[in-house]
Amino acid sequence: MVIDTSALVCIVLEEPEAAAFASAIFEDSIRLVSVVSLVEAGIVLEKALGRAGSEELEFAIRTLKLSIQPVTVDQGQTALLAHWRYGRGLHRAALNFGDCFTYALAKRTNEPLLFKGNDFGRTDLRLVALS
């Protein structure tokens, strides 16, 4: 699976869905996250928790045994296509910059996406079904 920023933030902030997201991650042997998502999550979590946000994110990465993926040229091209197809102001999915890279990683690896919210549900990606 590919894990979106929204799922990581949910887990670190211990939001109501956190346990379900963590369980879904532990049940899958493939746990990919884009380095762009980690930067985005770090920004969000430091805004919410101060410097401890990055420390909590690092702890979650280790605990969940996430595989951090670099951005490839192919992913960059796919992210741009995702923007034109599903981007904010262009489509009701309203993907932002970081979302486009998550989309690209999921699309290029053909892995289902774990996310919180409605945005990716309006795209053509395979999605993780929570139990």
In which residue ranges do the predicted regions lie?
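Acidic, PIN/NYN-like endoribonuclease modules and their adjacent C-terminal/linker elements
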Residues: 103-131
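Short loop->beta-strand "edge-of-pocket" segments that line small-molecule binding or catalytic clefts
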Residues: 30-32, 65-69
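Alpha-helix capping/helix-boundary segments
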Residues: 8, 37-38, 75, 102, ...
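Short, well-structured N-terminal submotif of metal-dependent ribonuclease cores
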Residues: 1-33, 46-59, 122, 131
